[in-house]
A protein has these predicted regions:
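Amphipathic alpha-helical coiled-coil segments
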Residues: 18-22, 44-66
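Short, charge/polar-rich alpha-helical segments
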Residues: 1-17, 43
Length: 66
């Protein structure tokens, strides 16, 4: 079970990185187009990854509670 804790920590890092990259892409596209086109393209994916990240963070918190 400790293996899952380590996997969750790694997954948290990966998800955080992906979210940050997508937010940067979103900002770049918005600046290039002068519109909210980047938000249109990336907001759903970012939201889904943030939900998954929150789930992983809760799992990590549960593990740290033991």
């Amino acid at each position: 079970m400790e293996q899952r804790y380590l996997e969750a920590l790694e997954e948290e890092k990966i998800l955080s990185t992906k979210i940050m990259e997508l937010k940067n892409l979103e900002k770049k596209v918005n600046e290039e187009t002068g519109e909210e086109y980047g938000s249109y393209l990336y907001s759903t994916k970012i939201n889904l990854l943030e939900l998954k990240l929150n789930k992983v963070k809760r799992e990590i918190k549960d593990w740290e509670g033991f």
